Amino acid sequence: METRTRLSPNAARLARSGNGDSVGRLGIQALKETAPTSPITPPLPKDRAWVHSRRMKLIGVIPARYASTRFPGKPLHPIAGIPLIQRVVERCRLSPALSEVIVATDDERIAAFARGFCRVEMTRDDHPSGTDRIAEVASRVPADGYINIQGDEPLMDPAVINAVAEALRDSDMSTASTPIRDLAEFDNPNVVKVVTTAGGRALYFSRRTIPYLRDAAQKSLAEQWASYPFQKHLGIYGYRRDTLLRLVGFPVSPLEAAEKLEQLRALENGFSIAVARVEHDSVGVDVPTDVARVEALLASTASVTHCA
């Protein structure tokens, strides 16, 4: 963070009087007032301040599994004529925050196809989570940080990637949230909610609706939903390299096991997670019936940029 230094009123008077000895006796620290250019943003820790001195090298990593329980072979399924994994790569390449995009997979069928337009890193097939798969890539491909992008979101807005990348500059991890706009998502345990500090750091993620509105508890769900700006968590993560490699060394945490949310392992072990608030909502392909819905959305939007 940039600072500017100015003399205190007493020091200024001494300087004008030419009494340099008096100034020296007061001491440099007593004469200087350091005024942050932004009074809200705290100083960066020394081990992290370097990220502001240059552009971070961030790599987008898309974990891709063939053996999906609800939709086997999903990454290769065509979405309006183009396989899903290629759609996701194309969207990621629209983000100027990413230096490179990598598909991380344990399946040779996905790898053989993706090599035609993207770098591929083969990973083990026993990873318990996407975070562990990303960490394996990070152990071989050096960068300042990594953005974990879901492989089933062919409409990913590059502005969300940019926001998560920017939030990572002064945090261990970063992610994104968006307002809950649909009442059907308000009490849905498959829609993860997040609450943050005033400065945008994650306090907690839950499948339950948080915060609990005590004064509105007896009201209808619609009334509760309308009375507070509830935030939906989007499944995109940014990790600093050192954070990622440390994080996967911790065992599954109690809260992670209870909620089945891997980001809680980070919070329980003291890592900070910056949450970028965005307007774009995620539209994923979870089951085969989602394909028609996504294709309709694609048809109603501008043409999609294809890989070079």
Which role fits each region the language model picked out?
Residues 105-106, 156, 239, 286:
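A conserved hydrophobic position in a structured secondary element of the catalytic/binding core
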Residues 57-104:
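N-terminal glycine-rich phosphate-binding loop and ensuing alpha1 helix
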Residues 39, 51-52:
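Short, positively charged and aromatic/hydrophobic N-terminal segments
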Residues 156-253:
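Conserved core of the sugar-phosphate nucleotidyltransferase
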Residues 2-3, 7-14, 21-23, 30-35, ...:
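Short amphipathic, helix-prone segments within low-complexity/disordered or flexible regions
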Residues 219-308:
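Conserved alpha/beta core of the MobA/IspD/sugar-nucleotide pyrophosphorylase nucleotidyltransferase superfamily
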Residues 6, 59, 153, 193, ...:
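A residue-level structural signature of the nucleotidyltransferase/glycosyltransferase Rossmann-like core
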Residues 102, 108-166:
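Short phosphate-binding loop-to-helix
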